[in-house]
Amino acid sequence: MKVAVLGAGAWGTALAGHLAARHDTVLWARDATLISELSTSHENARYLAGVALPSTLRFQANLELALNHALDDAALCVVATPVAGLRAMLRTMRDMRKVPSHIVWLCKGFEADSQLMPHQVVAQELSGHTSNGPLSGPSFAREVGQGLPVALTVASASAACRERTVAAFHHGAMRIYSGDDVVGVEVGGAVKNVLAIATGIADGLGLGLNARAALITRGLAEMSRLGAALGGRAETFTGLTGLGDLILTATGDLSRNRTVGMQLASGRSLDDILNALGHVAEGVRCARSVLSLAQSHAIDMPITQAVCDVLFNGVAPRDAVSALLRRDAKPE
């Protein structure tokens, strides 16, 4: 199978390496210098240092040529840009008249200005295109790059998209499950990043494992309430892309969002943390959107509110935790 992966960050690089073990795979990045480095060393020293990439993986700085690789009906295009870059990528595909038949995206979050989910952005930019959907689940790029076991879910209304994605990714140490609850998968992937900041704050304050468990459990309730209001199915939020991804992101040392929370608890400013991180922390980008959507649907999300207070409203992490603890008792 021919596969084009668009975006050579850590996640795009790791998945391109996995795909190249079985398929004719091209990895695209707009940075020609990065492509030159990748072609020379077969290692992404910027974003996934220390992980050797297969010699069969090819690299491309020309987007048109990369898209040509995925135009065949039997091919697959994997969009590995952040949410903030998704619309521009789709628009470029459309304007070039190089829209692949089957598209999956890896980003998690909501578009900041519109508060749209990724699939809604796709519907706006690629009207009439149906063989598409998110590939999501509990996964750290470094572990995937190292060939460690992982399970992901592809969600699409299109059976062809689901089948094509499973055929591409389901080999080696990677298991792919499939379903059609696109909304549930995308809500889970967005909200878990915000909740991971909360658990990072609690861990950074030394509040203990009991507090972490409470935040994860009550956070899952917030995720489920918002997801149901937006049209997701309840069972999705106890699956890989809901509870599974939440557990990993809220507890794993490789989690950028948890790291942000821990650093906030230590007293560092958000700007300093993000500058030092050097990578996207989607929980910071989409926290306001999650809270705004919750408020517009009259959904109570106190943990999300606390995270937004710390990130954007000048509330000290310990004061935000104290406010949560002062909330009135209520039935579970």
UniProtKB/Swiss-Prot annotation:
Give the catalysed reaction(s), semicolon-separated: sn-glycerol 3-phosphate + NAD(+) = dihydroxyacetone phosphate + NADH + H(+); sn-glycerol 3-phosphate + NADP(+) = dihydroxyacetone phosphate + NADPH + H(+)
SUPFAM superfamilies, from UniProt?
A: 6-phosphogluconate dehydrogenase C-terminal domain-like (SSF48179), NAD(P)-binding Rossmann-fold domains (SSF51735)
Q: What class of enzyme is it?
A: oxidoreductase
E.C. code: 1.1.1.94
In the record, biological process GO terms are: carbohydrate metabolic process; glycerol-3-phosphate biosynthetic process; glycerol-3-phosphate catabolic process; glycerophospholipid metabolic process; phospholipid biosynthetic process
Q: Name one Pfam family in it.
A: NAD_Gly3P_dh_C
- Pathway the protein acts in: Membrane lipid metabolism; glycerophospholipid metabolism
The record lists sn-glycerol 3-phosphate as bound by K108, G137, S139, K192, D245, S255, R256, N257
Write out the catalytic residues in the record: K192
Q: Where does NADPH bind?
A: W11, R30, K108, A141, R256, V280, E282
Q: Name one GO molecular function term.
A: glycerol-3-phosphate dehydrogenase [NAD(P)+] activity
A single GO cellular-component term from the record reads: cytosol
**Which keywords annotate this record?**
Cytoplasm, Lipid biosynthesis, Lipid metabolism, NAD, NADP, Nucleotide-binding, Oxidoreductase, Phospholipid biosynthesis, Phospholipid metabolism
Provide the protein's localization.
Cytoplasm
Its family remark reads: Belongs to the NAD-dependent glycerol-3-phosphate dehydrogenase family.
Q: What does this protein do?
A: Catalyzes the reduction of the glycolytic intermediate dihydroxyacetone phosphate (DHAP) to sn-glycerol 3-phosphate (G3P), the key precursor for phospholipid synthesis.
Q: Report the protein name in the record.
A: Glycerol-3-phosphate dehydrogenase [NAD(P)+]
Higher taxonomy: Bacteria, Pseudomonadati, Pseudomonadota, Betaproteobacteria, Burkholderiales
- What gene is this protein a product of? gpsA
